[in-house]
Amino acid sequence: AYDRFMAGGLIHNLRLPARPFQFVLAPMYSFKTQSAVGTGMLAYHIFPRQYFQRISLALHGNSFHHDQSDLNLSKPLYLRHQKLAPSVQFVFKPSSARSTVQNSLMLKYYYIGEEAFRYQRDLTDSLIRPKIISGDEQHLGRLVFLHQNKRTLNPYSYNLDIQANQQFLKIGLTAELRIDYHMPERAFYVRAFGGKFFEFDPNQSSFSIQNQYLTATYTGNNDWIYDGVYLDRNAQSGWKTQQIAMQEGGLKIRTLMYASPLGRSDNWLASVNLRSDLPFSFPLKLQLFFDAATFANAAQLNPSGNKVLFDGGIQLNMFKERLVVYLPLLMSKDFKDYSKSVYAKNRMLQNMSFALRFHPFEWMDQQKEWLQLLQ
């Protein structure tokens, strides 16, 4: 978001059949920040004869800007981050050539380097101005096991995601099931999530890792490892803050103006997300959705005393669900009270949210789709 309009190129060697060595590089120039930015990935694939269908060694990196300040300045300053993430993925051989089951295990390490602002008084005019300094370096180890059954009817998947560093351990289990109706291209979708968070040093400031906590509604400030594409990661108001992601709790309503948003937990969180195709044809790809979540000490943390947060409404899917717009029509009391206290008008529009499912370098398992987009 802070880099705004960017121009650059896309350099890649993607083709079918896949080559052992593949790369995608996207160097760009940001006209807003007047600096070079970009992202890219290198990968080398090994195809063993036994046990594994594929072993992929990859390195993903990017550098963009994630915040700005123009306090008492004629020209704003922008904070940059750098990310390096080497990984190895093991795709296990199926039991037979006709098997619809696929299992994979990924090990990944993240290095995140961020700049930060230090605000200090300028002795020349006694005004407080920001200064860019080197911020904290973040490290994360991640293990993801994914099981998929891509059968024609009622396919399902589940994944175990374990994240850890010197400050915390977070474990998440997500399961998804599509129940096909007896109608073409009509189905009922079920997603369930359960997560547990362990904090290694309870005496440290919770502010330093609050974005790593489990959350019912996943927004840009929760994506501290910069895996997703967000239009604004740090703002608390404006239409860009209406962007969410279908991660962790999967709820659709944001409460960013609270010091501690509803549904944030440093202990455990569980949720279920339901959506259904409409039984009749419609020019737009509309679905109905309903979400519910509960978490540790919910009755004490929710202002209403209720143990469950929920929302439901209509969603519009566009571009093969790469852009999804959510319109909540019903919600739990805590969400209603937040909406009344924060939004003076246009509450229905303010409660709307959208998700961008755009991960440019998840192409190792989706190469046919990305080749179509690149042509």
Predicted stretch roles:
Residues 1-53, 91-101, 117-154, 261-272, ...:
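Outer-membrane beta-barrel initiation region
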Residues 1-4, 13-15, 27-33, 44-46, ...:
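Transmembrane beta-strands of outer-membrane beta-barrel pores
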Residues 38, 54-77, 84-90, 129-278, ...:
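C-terminal outer-membrane beta-barrel translocator/porin domains of Gram-negative envelope proteins
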Residues 74-80, 120-127, 206-213, 303-308, ...:
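Flexible, surface-exposed loop regions and adjacent strand-edge segments
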Residues 265-268, 279-282, 306-310, 317-319, ...:
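A structural signal for short secondary-structure junctions
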Residues 300, 304-341:
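C-terminal structured domain segments
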Residues 316-322, 345-375:
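Outer-membrane beta-barrel "beta-signal"
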